A protein has these predicted regions:
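Class I SAM-dependent methyltransferase SAM-binding "motif I" and its flanking Rossmann-like core
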Residues: 72-73, 77-104
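Residues that form or immediately flank small-molecule/cofactor binding pockets and catalytic motifs
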Residues: 36, 88-90, 116
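Short beta-strand segments
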Residues: 59-61, 86, 112
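A short acidic, often aromatic-flanked loop/helix-cap motif at beta-alpha or helix-coil junctions
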Residues: 37-41, 91-93, 134
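Acidic/Gly/His-enriched mid-domain segments of enzyme catalytic cores or analogous surface patches
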Residues: 1-81
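N-terminal start-of-chain detector that recognizes signal peptides
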Residues: 55-57, 82-85, 91, 122-126, ...
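Long, charged alpha-helical interface segments
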Residues: 95-167
């Protein structure tokens, strides 16, 4: 639970259906409570409140129910590309056209096309030079850095970058 992890909480948003009454009483920040039966997920409600920030970090958004994990990934892929999903073992972010730097915080690094694109990787075990990656391909699964930092260049399209420390 985020409430036990010591993160500073500025606002709590959602239906709180998975939170015990005891834990709910521990929330000391402003609360925006929504009905359980609604058209949005709790994550979507929270992201909408923060949509103007450059980067939004969603902690714990990949734990628990797989349907909610997939929904959170899809929110990052298609609606709010400034969202980074992160937990103690992995991080998922969107890389659009441009040059991006990745450090060696994570051992396994994969790239999945959100739309067909062109990808270059340097400083990686499996480098690429302007490789066209089609939407159905998994060719760029499980790479790793050979240096302290790797350079990712997206010339076309956009990619989901999955970084993990799982074995």
């Amino acid at each position: 639970k985020i409430i036990d992890q010591g993160f500073p909480i500025k606002m709590a948003v959602g239906d709180f259906d998975s939170l015990s009454e005891e834990d709910f009483k521990r929330i000391t920040c402003p609360i925006e409570r929504h009905p359980i039966m609604k058209d949005e997920t709790d994550s979507e409600l929270a992201i909408r409140l923060c949509k103007d920030y450059d980067t939004i970090y969603l902690y714990g958004a990949m734990q628990g129910r797989i349907d909610h994990t997939i929904a959170n990934i899809r929110l990052a892929m298609y609606r709010f590309q400034n969202v980074v999903l992160i937990d103690e073992h992995q991080k998922i972010s969107v890389m659009n056209v441009g040059v991006h730097e990745i450090d060696d915080s994570y051992h396994h690094i994969s790239f999945y096309p959100i739309q067909e694109g062109v990808l270059s990787l340097s400083g990686f075990l499996y480098p690429l030079d302007k490789r066209r990656i089609h939407i159905e391909e998994i060719y760029t699964t499980s790479n790793s850095l050979t240096e302290k930092k790797g350079i990712v260049r997206v010339d076309e399209g956009s990619f989901l970058c999955v970084q993990s420390n799982w074995r």
